[in-house]
C-alpha cells in the first residue's frame, strides 16, 4: 500500500510541494491509474501557493504501478477546496513554474489572490493552469467573480517584466498592466491600460510608499482628459488627482 509518508516524500522530491493532513488514500484504476487523496493541505515551495481542503489525484505512470515502494507520476490534478496565491511572490512562482517538470492542474477551486496578506479578490469555481516556455512563464485563472465569468493571466516575460491581464466581459471590464518590480515587488513601476464601460484609461505609475500616477489619459464618449496624481493607502484609502480636460464632446450632451 502507498503510505502518507511515501506520498509526501515523493511529492516533495519531485515537485517541491509539502503535503499534510491526508485524511484518506484511495487507488483508482480508471480513467487512468491514480492515487486520490482527500482533505489535503499543500504548500508549494516557500508558501508561494497554498491549497487547502482539496481532493488530489496523483496520475501515476502506468509502468510503475506494480512497485508500491516508488511513486512515479506524470501529473497532479487538484480539485475543490481553495487556493491562496500571493501576488508579491510572483517571481518565485514563475521560477517554480519554470523548474517544475510535472504537470499541475487545479479545477473547481476557490482562488484567493493576496497582496501583502490583503485580499485583492476571489474567484470561485476556478481553473488554474501553470505553463512554461523558453520566453514566458504563465499563470492562467478562469472562473467566476461575483457570478461573472472572469479571466486572469499573470505572465513573466523574457525581458523580466510582468504582465497582468484581467477580463470580465459581462461587466465590460478589461485591464492590462505591465510591471517592472524591484525588491520582490515592494517597489515597482509600470503602465496600465484599463477599459470600463467604453471608458478608456491609460497611465504610468510608480509604487513606493504610495502610488504616483503620471501621464494619465482618459477617453470617453463625453470627454477626453489628461490627469496625474497620487493614491494613498495609509491611514486609509484616498487619492488626489489633477485633471485637465482636453476635449469635450458636446454633441453627446444633447
For the regions a language model picked out, list residue spans one by one.
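Short alpha-helix boundary/capping motifs
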Residues: 2, 133, 195-196
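Amphipathic hydrophobic-ligand
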Residues: 17-20, 45-60, 88-91, 116-129, ...
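Flexible beta-edge/linker motif
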Residues: 20-117, 122, 131, 137-140, ...
